[in-house]
Curated annotation (Swiss-Prot):
Segments forming a coiled coil: none
Entry similarity comment: Belongs to the RapZ-like family.
InterPro entries named among the record's database cross-references: P-loop_NTPase, RapZ-like, RapZ-like_N, RapZ_C
Organism annotation: Anaeromyxobacter sp. (strain Fw109-5)
Name of the protein in question: Nucleotide-binding protein Anae109_0152
Length: 294
């Protein structure tokens, strides 16, 4: 294994989380992003899988592996195996998907599936509780936890796709997301910025139907003196923060910019901020979460 790591092994994502949180959707998104995906491979075979990938002449450079409650008695070995591989220098990231108990119960009710850990009681809440306990050690070592409570399958797929769309560039991956406070805060955001202090195009009849990506709306929003000052100050702040986050070893940063409905002001400002960051050499993933919502 050491020989493989020294040669430069593949990028590995361990996808885990509670049942019903969206792992199947996330795995499909990873496959679309170019990962070789393996569902329900016993974690003890991970080292062998990495070893075999070293004989593919670079054809397998990104691997995604689902590790969850189906591992059974092997699940307890997962944190140890992952830690050992990391210590050998492998590029392994653990992505944990979670959701509120209420949303998980609702999802199981909609699909009428039995929870895999329901046990003799057969109830979904009992299964959820047992699974949370079984996965606690994996969640503790996760590089990122994504709460999918408020995300639909399309939003989750977009999030994962943009999160892993490229493996090159700066060590710190930056995502700028616009959103509407009406639809709740992005649960995965590291920095949240409120731009509701700006004049709202919603109240201008000729601008109301158009999103912040429309040049007319963008000109109106970005032409405001306060919008210009906001961009200058936020750019200065990020110019201070990003090098320090990199030095700390932080891999990902999500900056969320919100307005009332997530259609006009936040969209225009998020696009402008992303453009500034990219102009400074920082690759950025831009996501307008609520722009199509009413």
């Amino acid at each position: 294994m050491n020989e493989l790591v020294n040669r430069g092994g593949p990028e590995v994502v361990i996808l885990t989380g509670v049942s019903g949180s969206g792992k199947s959707t996330a795995l499909r998104a990873l496959e679309d992003a170019g990962f070789y995906c393996v569902d329900n491979l016993p974690i003890l075979f991970l080292e062998k899988l990495l070893e075999l990938s070293g004989h593919t002449a670079g054809e397998v450079s990104r691997i995604a592996l689902v590790v969850d409650a189906r591992e059974g008695r092997f699940l307890a070995d997962a944190p140890r195996v992952i830690q050992e591989i990391r210590q050998q220098g492998a590029d392994v990231e653990v992505l944990f998907l979670d959701a509120s108990d209420e949303s998980l119960v609702r999802r199981y009710s909609e699909t009428r599936r039995r929870h895999p850990l329901a046990g003799e009681s057969g109830t979904v809440p009992d299964g959820i509780a047992a699974e949370r306990q079984a996965l606690a050690a994996l969640k503790a070592i996760a590089d990122e936890v994504i709460d999918t409570t408020t995300l639909n399958v399309h939003e989750l797929k977009r999030l994962v796709t943009r999160r892993f769309a490229t493996s090159e560039g700066a060590r710190l991956g930056v995502t700028v997301v616009s959103f509407g406070f009406r639809f709740g805060l992005p649960t995965h955001a590291d920095v949240v910025l409120d731009v509701r202090f700006l004049p709202n195009p919603y109240f201008i009849p000729e601008l109301k139907p158009h999103p912040g990506t429309d040049p007319r709306v963008a000109r109106f929003v970005l032409g405001q003196p306060d919008a210009k000052a906001f961009l200058e100050r936020i750019s200065d702040l990020l110019g201070f923060l990003l090098p320090r986050y990199r030095a700390e070893g932080k891999s990902y940063l999500t900056i969320a910019i919100g307005c009332t409905g997530g259609k006009h002001r936040s969209v225009a400002l998020a696009g402008a901020l992303a453009e500034r960051l990219e102009g400074g050499g920082q690759p950025v993933r831009l996501w307008h979460r609520d722009v199509e919502k009413e």
